[in-house]
Amino acid sequence: MNASSKRKIISQSEISKKIAVMNEEMQGFWANNSWDIRKCPHPSAIELSKNPALRNRWVRFERVKNLWLRTELKYFYFYHLNNGIWNAKTVWIRKGTVINKMLDFLDLKYPSITSITEVPIDKAMTEYRTYLTKQGVRITTTNYKITANQEKTPVKANSYYVTNLKQFIEFIEDFYFDGEEWDKDVWDRRNLPLPDDKVNPTQYEYTINFKGFRNTYFKQLVKRYCKLRLNMDSFSYVSDIAQKLKEFFNFLDIKFKHVQRVHQLTRVEIEAYLSELNMMGIKPSTITGRISILEGLFSTLHRLEWDDVPSKLLIYPEDYPKIPRAKPRFIDEFVLEQLNSHLDKLPEYIATMTMIVQECGMRISELCTLKKGCLLEDKDGYYFLKYYQWKMKKEHIVPISKEVVLLIKVREDKVSEEFPDSEYLFPRKDGSPLKQETFRGELNKLAYEQNIVDKLGEIYRFHAHAFRHSVGTRTINNGVPQHIVQKFLGHESPEMTSRYAHIFDETLKNEFTKFQEKLVTNNGDVLNLDDDSEVDDVELQWFKKNINAQVLPNGYCRLPVIAGGCPHANACLDCTHFCTSKQFLPQHEEQLERTEELLTIAKDKQWQRQIETNSRVKERLEQIIGSLTG
């Protein structure tokens, strides 16, 4: 069997038809064998051609004399340019000299083939690496990445010269594939009829890879199962299912070669696999996930009555490890202060995203897919942020401060000018939403470069979800009722929010004291936070669920921060929005003492207005102090 049939490539006659289709699509400028960027109709080429520093004007496909190969090459670049995958800069600048080397190699090495698919990809890549090395061209490049330990480390990768040929061969093999996308060993989500809610556009995960299975039968079984699961689950989760089942069945093939079908499985193999997992040193939650995926497969085989099903129950409840109650991975204020002091060193859009997520605590996918027009304003001038929750598959609305509103408005103006066709607040150059990895990468790069450290002096590693944990933990610890936090974060159940109801040892005593203290209004009335009628009060709801509640020198203002600065300077004691607690008692006693002194002077001098004002202040303070000490 030749290499082409192994890869399920269509017949030569069908390839000839495909070549004809390629030529039909490449009309006008694209039919030329030399592409001049100054004549290219692609919008990105028109813009790039105006750059006086542009050195590489031509892509000369005529260097390849083999007409079949030349057509495949031209179509490879034509397709990527006209389907939004690449822009002109990618072809004429990034791949400029790279293309010429590849064209010369193909013309030299394969002058007589009728398709690049006649050459096994491994053979072609080996020959090309040898060719480049003899030409004095580097076949690897060194990139640097920030590791999970916040260390900068070099990473070797194939150079553009090597990857360009690999991309070309894989593209043509895919184009000539004899079958549906489901028949391939690598499923590309862009070629599958998946609804939008199955695909998170903020992730780089484009494929589900079934290569690497040691047993072909089990590979086909897993492919069928994954196709079924795509009806219920997200693309990224099904990709994880495929990888975890590959690990299990490869384990079987290595340790229990005699097991060739699912119905041959016994507890012996399962227990050996569980032991293997436990010896890997992975977290209990990770082990639970792998067992759950395996049990899900076995359960589905039984329920849907597939031909090959387990002969007995293989997974028991006691197989699942006990998972410790997860503590919220909040970001310490010590770290946040450092981060915020260096926001100016981040790209403008990343800094804006950081401010939004610190206040609203949304998930990273929700942050990246914020859309233009996400601000809502009510009749009182208060602003709210509207965004889509990918996990819950629903729209969510939260109150937002005027400071962040201003940042969003500035960003909207900028994006509308630079990316008028994109609906997103933080788009990539192609108009799609920013990828999660870009946000995380920029924050951790900043932490490394600016030496943002934790209290132990270690460079801090930012995880996007930790901002959500920080908002949840901070609000719970500040006494906000759990059901309010649940609504603010958009949790479906109280259990999802309860993980934030954790006060850490360092602040346990102080937080408990704060929780127990009384809140008193300007009239000395006690606010009972557990009273249902008080909880339903609109102003107190705002006070509780506003993350950035306004703290005064002698108490709190129940007006939400979103309302802006108070126009009534030094009038808190006469304001119905004012409330205070026992921790401010010394300030009230000191103010009462000063007020009594001023009142004595006013009476001596018979300053009637000052007597009235200070008498009212004295009365308010006495009511407050009496309630706090009573």
UniProtKB/Swiss-Prot annotation:
Q: Which InterPro entries match?
A: CB, DNA_brk_join_enz, Integrase-like_cat_sf, Integrase_catalytic, Integrase_recombinase_N, Tyrosine_recombinase_XerCD
Keywords in UniProt for this one? DNA integration, DNA recombination, DNA-binding, Transposable element
Q: Which GO terms describe its molecular function?
A: DNA binding
Return the PROSITE patterns for the record: CB, TYR_RECOMBINASE
Q: List each copy of the Tyr recombinase domain by range.
A: 326-513
In this protein, the active site sits at R363, K391, H465, R468, H491, Y500
Where's the Core-binding (CB) domain? 216-302
Iron-sulfur listed as a keyword: no
GO:BP terms for this protein? DNA integration; DNA recombination
Q: Which family does it belong to?
A: Belongs to the 'phage' integrase family.
Q: What is this protein called?
A: Transposase B from transposon PsiTn554
Species name for this entry?
A: Staphylococcus aureus
